[in-house]
């Protein structure tokens, strides 16, 4: 082995500033309105935004979902109508029909272009109707659709209480869910559970994940004696976590850099920079990093990770030695690539619409470390990739699997390249130790389909159909 071979490989970043495809960030309404149960989302935009939401959500109007579309008309754009009066009328109707704890205004490209001052209108509307109004500019000017959640959470972070409530009524309201979870349990059991935690500064997690994931990740930290003080967003707006100066915060998704910045600058919180808890390797590194910050010796993580890898060996055999190519869509690419490399795959290229190197620094370091341990080359990271150039590279490299946005899936399949929609990873449960099988189920599905076609002798028919 030469000296050059022994040197650690460095990450190679490129920026093509080309045309790539991703959804509009207003799609964040699809999962956030379900996560925050007492909220109402009002998207202020054109008919195009309405058509997109209607198609993306797939919720019939009879279901009375907790979101609506405020369509801008010619009178709004030409300033013939008064924005304040129109929004006040809509908010009063929302209060009368649904009476939410918070109304979230989602700005769109059009509100940006016509310079609609939503931030200026919101405080006055809020005082008149008596319901908090949060303004989030989750418009198509962002790089990726997942950044819509980032914008909403950054806006909500500024609404988190700065100190714990002192009034009994406020305490009752904020602890309603906790009381429900402890219903039927003896007081001694609750006190004993509290004594299991180590004394450490308060820790708040941020990132919208399904309730089972919240429970799983909180339990993983509880096993190490770490108590999670709260989650942003909470199940209810009235239960937003208290964030005081000096509190520690940790993100569970790679696309929340704006929220992290807001928590550090506005709320003076301390960010724990760690790999994200995606896959057993990422979850272990995430827990270990939090433990190291609180000077806690982690226990049982190595055995837990080994057990998970052993339980998914049947899936690993399908992808070990195969190659993957990320076209870039939802900002989960770095974490997923690192996980798949750990599974035994090689990654040619990681396309990503936007790369915050500070927020993802720990994940990038972990990617390099994983590549070195697995003995594979470090993939090139292409920011704002040009899809035309990517298609040329895919044609040359011929990867076994391409993880891509929906726009390119069918054209690539028609050229004999196996694909997987990246949007599926956004909505699937991929965090924590317990969901490793779910990620591998998604990744291996196209490969298993190809194997089934081959076994049935239909592979030749499929190739003829492509021609």
Swiss-Prot record:
SUPFAM superfamilies: Helical backbone' metal receptor (SSF53807). Pathway: Porphyrin-containing compound metabolism; chlorophyll biosynthesis (light-independent). Binds 1 [4Fe-4S] cluster per heterodimer. The cluster is bound at the heterodimer interface by residues from both subunits. It holds the Pfam family Oxidored_nitro. GO terms for biological process: light-independent chlorophyll biosynthetic process; photosynthesis, dark reaction. This is Light-independent protochlorophyllide reductase subunit N. Gene3D superfamilies: Nitrogenase molybdenum iron protein domain. Component of the dark-operative protochlorophyllide reductase (DPOR) that uses Mg-ATP and reduced ferredoxin to reduce ring D of protochlorophyllide (Pchlide) to form chlorophyllide a (Chlide). This reaction is light-independent. The NB-protein (ChlN-ChlB) is the catalytic component of the complex. The gene is chlN. Its cofactor is [4Fe-4S] cluster. Protochlorophyllide reductase is composed of three subunits; ChlL, ChlN and ChlB. Forms a heterotetramer of two ChlB and two ChlN subunits. InterPro entries: LIPOR_BchN/ChlN (IPR050293), Nase/OxRdtase_comp1 (IPR000510), Protochl_reductN (IPR005970). [4Fe-4S] cluster binds at residues 24, 49, 109. It catalyses: chlorophyllide a + oxidized 2[4Fe-4S]-[ferredoxin] + 2 ADP + 2 phosphate = protochlorophyllide a + reduced 2[4Fe-4S]-[ferredoxin] + 2 ATP + 2 H2O. NCBIfam families: DPOR_bchN, PRK02842.1. Its EC number is 1.3.7.7. Keywords: 4Fe-4S, ATP-binding, Chlorophyll biosynthesis, Iron, Iron-sulfur, Metal-binding, Nucleotide-binding, Oxidoreductase, Photosynthesis. Belongs to the BchN/ChlN family. GO terms for molecular function: 4 iron, 4 sulfur cluster binding; ATP binding; metal ion binding; oxidoreductase activity, acting on iron-sulfur proteins as donors; oxidoreductase activity, acting on the CH-CH group of donors, iron-sulfur protein as acceptor.
């Amino acid at each position: 082995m030469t000296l050059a071979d022994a040197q650690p490989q460095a990450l190679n970043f490129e920026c093509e500033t080309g045309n790539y495809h991703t959804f509009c960030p207003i799609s964040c309404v699809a999962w956030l309105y379900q996560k925050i149960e007492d909220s109402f989302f009002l998207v202020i935009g054109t008919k195009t935004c309405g058509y997109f939401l209607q198609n993306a959500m797939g919720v019939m109007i009879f279901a009375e979902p907790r979101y609506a579309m405020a369509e801008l008309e010619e009178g709004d754009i030409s300033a013939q109508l008064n924005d304040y009066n129109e929004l006040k009328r809509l908010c009063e109707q929302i209060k009368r029909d649904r009476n939410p704890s918070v109304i979230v205004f989602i700005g769109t490209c059009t509100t940006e272009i016509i310079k609609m001052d939503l931030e200026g209108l919101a405080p006055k509307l809020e005082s008149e109707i008596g319901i908090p109004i949060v303004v989030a500019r989750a418009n198509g000017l962002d790089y990726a659709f997942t950044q819509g959640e980032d914008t909403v959470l950054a806006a909500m972070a500024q609404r988190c209480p700065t100190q714990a409530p002192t009034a009994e009524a406020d305490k009752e309201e904020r602890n309603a869910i906790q009381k429900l979870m402890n219903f039927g349990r003896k007081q001694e059991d609750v006190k004993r559970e509290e004594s299991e935690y180590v004394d450490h500064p308060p820790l708040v997690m941020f990132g919208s994940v399904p309730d089972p994931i919240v429970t799983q990740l909180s339990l993983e930290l509880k096993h190490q004696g770490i108590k999670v003080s709260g989650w942003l967003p909470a199940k209810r707006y009235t239960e937003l976590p208290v964030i005081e100066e000096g509190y520690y915060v940790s993100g569970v998704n790679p696309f929340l850099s704006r929220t992290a910045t807001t928590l550090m600058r506005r709320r003076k919180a301390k960010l724990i920079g760690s790999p994200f808890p995606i896959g057993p390797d990422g979850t272990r590194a995430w827990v270990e990093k939090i433990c190291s910050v609180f000077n806690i010796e982690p226990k049982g993580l190595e055995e837990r990770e080994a057990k998970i890898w052993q339980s998914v060996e049947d899936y690993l055999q399908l992808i070990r030695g195969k190659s993957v190519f990320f076209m870039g869509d939802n900002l989960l690419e770095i974490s997923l690539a690192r996980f798949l490399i750990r599974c035994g795959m090689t990654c040619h290229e990681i396309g990503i619409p936007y790369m915050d190197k500070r927020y993802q620094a720990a994940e990038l370091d972990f990617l390099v470390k994983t590549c070195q341990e697995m003995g594979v080359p470090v993939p090139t990271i292409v920011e704002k990739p040009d899809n035309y150039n990517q298609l040329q590279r895919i044609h040359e490299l011929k990867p076994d699997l391409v993880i891509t946005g929906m726009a390119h899936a069918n054209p690539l399949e028609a050229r004999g390249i196996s694909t997987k929609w990246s949007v599926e990873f956004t909505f699937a449960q991929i965090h924590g130790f317990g969901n490793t099988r779910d990620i591998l189920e998604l990744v291996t599905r196209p490969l298993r389909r190809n194997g089934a076609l081959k076994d049935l002798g239909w592979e030749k028919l499929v190739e003829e159909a492509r021609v």
